[in-house]
A protein has these predicted regions:
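Surface-exposed binding patches on compact interaction domains or structured appendages
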Residues: 27-31, 57-111, 203-206, 210-216
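Beta-strand-rich interaction surfaces with strong enrichment in secreted/lumenal proteins
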Residues: 35-37, 95-101, 220-226, 237-239, ...
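Short proline/glycine- and polar residue-rich coil/turn motifs
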Residues: 99-106, 223-231, 258, 270
Length: 271
C-alpha cells in the first residue's frame, strides 16, 4: 500500500463541494490518502486511517463514504455512496465515523473491509473527512437549519481488488495526430481501454522509428491510471523535431505484471 499524507494549514476550496460554505481557517492532517485492500472473497481486512488536529482549538471530524466515477480525461466525479456498480460502500465499515479532537490530538480510524464470497471483482470509493463547525442558530446560514457548517474536506481514495484476481488487460486504439498544448511540436492522441478487472497503473510513451535508417527512439513516459471498464483519452507530445523522412510512430502502454506492452502505430511523414 502506498502511503501519502495531506496537510491543510488554511481553508481550501475543495472541488468536491457542491455547496458554498463559510470560511474558517483549518489545520488538520489525514494519512494515508490512498488505501488499497487485497482481500480475497470471504476475507476481512482492516487498515488504519489517522486523523490529526493541528489547530489550536477543539475540532469535530466526520467521515462520510462516497462513490466516484471517472471521465475519459481522468476527472473524478463524486457520487452518492452505493450508487455505482463498482461501489464498495456495502463492504467497508468506518469505525468510528465521527471524532472530536483536542489541539494536537490524533485519532485512529479502523477501515474494515468485509468481502462477500461472491466478491471477485475490483471496487473503489472514497472517504471524505470533513471538519464540522457549530454555530448558534441565529448565526447560522438560513439554509443550514441544523446550525452545523461543513467546511472543505480531505478525500481518501479506497480500492479493493482480490489477490486472486490477476485479470490485467488493456488495449491502445484510435491513434491520431491532434493539436497539442505546444503548437511548436506535434501531438498524438490515443484511447486506452481497460478490458480486464484490475486497475492499470500504466506508463505510456511515444516511440519513433526512422524507416530508412532503422534508428529508434523512445521518449519519457507518463503515468496514467485506467480503471476497469474505463477508457482514457491521453495526448502525448513528440518532444523534438525529427529530420525529413518516413517514420513509424508508436503510442505504447506498459502496465507491468509480465504482460506484453500494448500499442498502436501510424506512419509519419516529415518534410
Amino acid at each position: 500500500m502506498q502511503i501519502f499524507s495531506t496537510r491543510i494549514r488554511f481553508l481550501l476550496i475543495n472541488l468536491f463541494l457542491t455547496l458554498t460554505v463559510c470560511c474558517y481557517p483549518q489545520d488538520f492532517e489525514v494519512a494515508p490518502v490512498l488505501v488499497s485492500f487485497d482481500a480475497n472473497p470471504g476475507e476481512n481486512q482492516t487498515q488504519v486511517l489517522t486523523v490529526r488536529n493541528h489547530s489550536n482549538e477543539r475540532q469535530k471530524f466526520v467521515l462520510n463514504l462516497a462513490d466516484y466515477t471517472l471521465t475519459m480525461e481522468g476527472t473524478k466525479s463524486v457520487m452518492e455512496a452505493g450508487s455505482t456498480q463498482r461501489s464498495l460502500a456495502d463492504w467497508i465499515t468506518v469505525n468510528p465515523s465521527f471524532v472530536e479532537l483536542n489541539p494536537n490530538e490524533s485519532a485512529s480510524i479502523n477501515l474494515i473491509m468485509t468481502v462477500p464470497r461472491t466478491g471477485f471483482n475490483t471496487r473503489w470509493g472514497m472517504i471524505q473527512v470533513e471538519v464540522a463547525k457549530e454555530q448558534m442558530a441565529s448565526e447560522a446560514d438560513k439554509q443550514l437549519s441544523t446550525g452545523v457548517i461543513i467546511v472543505p474536506r480531505i478525500v481518501v481514495l479506497v480500492k479493493q481488488s482480490p489477490r486472486s484476481n490477476q485479470n490485467y488487460r488493456g488495449t491502445v486504439t484510435g491513434l491520431r495526430e491532434v493539436e497539442g498544448p505546444d503548437p511548436e511540436f506535434r501531438s498524438f492522441e490515443a484511447i486506452l481501454t481497460n478490458t480486464g478487472d484490475k486497475i492499470l497503473e500504466a506508463k505510456v510513451f511515444l516511440a519513433l522509428a526512422n524507416l530508412e535508417t532503422a534508428e529508434e527512439k523512445q521518449f519519457n513516459p507518463v503515468s496514467v491510471s485506467v480503471y476497469p471498464e474505463q477508457q482514457r483519452k491521453v495526448v502525448l507530445t513528440l518532444p523534438e523535431h525529427p529530420g525529413p523522412g518516413q517514420y513509424a510512430l508508436a503510442f505504447l502502454m506498459d502496465y507491468g505484471h509480465r504482460m506484453a506492452i500494448e500499442g498502436a502505430q501510424i506512419l509519419l511523414t516529415v518534410e
